Amino acid sequence: MKITQLTTYRVPPRWMFLRIETDEGLIGWGEPVVEGHARAVQAAVHELEPYLIGQDPARINDLWQVMYRAGFYRGGAVFMSAIAGVDQALWDIKGKALGVPVYQLLGGLVRDRMRTYGWVGGDRPADVIDGIRQRVDAGFTHFKLNGCEELGIIDSSRAVDAAVARVAQIRAAFGNTVEFGLDFHGRVSVAMAAVLIKELEYLRPLFIEEPVLAEQAEHYPKLAAKTHLPLAAGERMYSRFEFKRVLAAGGIAILQPDLSHAGGISECLKIAAMAEAHDVAIAPHCPLGPIALASCLHVDYVSWNATLQEQGMGMHYNRGGEVLDYVLNPQDFRLDNGFIAPFTKPGLGVEINEALVLERSRDCPDWRNPVWRHADGSVAEW
């Protein structure tokens, strides 16, 4: 079997799908994208074509190493996301060729279902209580929300009090019948993260995500030493080599690799194993589409230390396209009290509605995250 063609489709709301075709008619799908930089990833995918066309898609490990090493320069969000989408599609082809789900190729199940969580509240968290009630009615017990709005490098007690009051309302309304993570989204400086975490600790959120930006990772162990709350990070780390340094330094209790950013299934399986060796959980990052979610779940199903799976159904970003819009088998993503059962179809288990993908890709707007500014006019972290 040989790879014959790579085709990319940018689709709403902010995703990109990759279709890899073979000379035997088997098709594999991947989801290579960096939100807000889809065109850059699209170009990177097609720059990889000379390493892929005419090659055997079953040689996933070799093709991954060629893509990563042959071009000399490597790493970063755009390049590793391009590799990630190709890798997902190659696993999809291999599973289809052998007639088994990808998790069987990775050694088989370690669990019978995977707990997922949904988002509430939006970019600037609002209507959180109503959002949680809707999720509870749908059977969820675990959620995530942004822990704060934009914060200055040193900010006011009022901003801290507002963030704490929001979380206190959740505990007052629901007690400990729900669990929630708080995403600082890299909006918070080291100094303000220490203040916020201390003030929030008594409310016992499940974890604090991206307490500071990944480029400030040397502060993770310092922040962890000041709290009993688990710290989570990883969505803006792109290879096992970046995760290696974070694991060695300590401080992070939950790694959150993104299967569409951090080299795909092949790389994230290694990251999960590295995390397990350090007694660290994984909870893959996935505010994306169905192929990314399926890829995450296959890693979750075979990784003992997978604890939670983010999923973007009903997420505030999904204007113009929902996670299951593009699939012909939405029943296989059915949520049962927040859990998703292992897929039974071969490959990734996602049947893509190619006609709809083609239609919506013809006039897909470019998605950009908003540019926020502080009161003094300086740019704020989103």
Curated annotation (Swiss-Prot):
Sorted alphabetically, which keywords does the UniProt record give? Lyase, Magnesium, Metal-binding
Q: Which Pfam families has this protein been placed in?
A: MR_MLE_C, MR_MLE_N
Q: Check the record and name the InterPro entries matching this protein.
A: DgoD-like, Enolase-like_C_sf, Enolase-like_N, Enolase_C-like, Galactonate_deHydtase, Mandel_Rmase/mucon_lact_enz_CS, Mandelate_racemase_C, Mandelate_racemase_N_dom
Q: Name one GO molecular function term.
A: galactonate dehydratase activity
Output the GO biological process annotations, alphabetical, semicolon-separated.
amino acid catabolic process; D-galactonate catabolic process
PROSITE patterns with a match to the protein in the record: MR_MLE_1 (PS00908), MR_MLE_2 (PS00909)
Question: What SMART domains does UniProt report for this protein, alphabetically?
Answer: MR_MLE
**Co-factor(s):** Mg(2+)
Pinpoint the site Increases basicity of active site His: D258
The entry's family comment says: Belongs to the mandelate racemase/muconate lactonizing enzyme family. GalD subfamily.
Instruction: Print the miscellaneous field.
Output: Reaction proceeds via an anti dehydration.
What name goes with this protein? Answer: D-galactonate dehydratase
Which organism is this protein's natural source?
Answer: Verminephrobacter eiseniae (strain EF01-2)
